Amino acid sequence: MRAVQRGRIEGIAPIAAGSAADREAAMRAAGARAIYLGEPGYPECLPAIADPPDVLFVRGSVPAVPMVAVVGTRRSTAYGRGIARAFGRAVAEAGWALCSGLARGIDGEAHRGSLEAGGPTVGVLGCGSDVAYPREHASLIAEVERAGAVVTEYPPGTPPHGWRFPPRNRIISGLSRAVVVVEAAATGGALVTAARAAEQGREVFAVPGDVDRESSLGCNLLIRDGAIPVLGAADLIEALTLVIGPPVTPATGDHPSIPAAGIAVEVLAERLGLTGQAFLAWLGRSEVLGSVRVEGDRVYPGGR
């Protein structure tokens, strides 16, 4: 664990001279707090990666539920942005937290989709937590903080130099149970995130696209190399449910008594208090576990 020594955090280049007290004042001014590796509050899944950050500067609260990363190119198409937003909504409705990089294009739309559905979301920055980058996302960054957390390994005031972003991508994948790439060129940050996810043992998903479109080439290459293709929001939730399972909450953890004659799907959803993707996630997981069986529009007890 790195210690605060001689007015700086050991191992992180200082952005300005100052004492430890100055750093604490800067964090307070930024509304951030420092969470060190091994201390309470440090995200549980990060220590398992090869190179976890020794300190995280956090604004907001990191959600306790499993996270799913949805990432992609800044140079996105309207089609890709629509998919990213739909995926963000679906992830939130299923009960997971959305993680992304708060960048232009795919990242921003994924965050917006999660926020629209009232879900928790986490944005990982490649700069200080008090630096709005890109500037036009200042209000989005504030919304993400209110709904979840803004996280970075860089101290307040750190500028968004390009070389800082590839290292931050390991945090996006490290925080998440799975990584979904919506649109990506053959090179770029989204493919870095996918590569780090694979190294960390996370499942990688990708949206197939036009073979002649540059913004789809990265996704098509990922699928060629073994990533799981996803064809829409419902397909994504079904695949994620098989990989990580829905989070256990009072609603999704309950298995109501299902009569031998079965029960209509819509009636079961109402009894569970679940709607949309959240219900589909519960139903898919329950089928996998063998606790229910679906035939047409009715659900029966498992094992029959």
Question: Where would I find each of the regions flagged by the language model?
Answer:
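Accessory alpha-helical DNA-binding modules that contact the DNA backbone or grooves
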Residues: 1-44, 289
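Glycine-biased, small-residue-rich flexible motifs in mid-sequence functional cores and linkers
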Residues: 28, 34-304
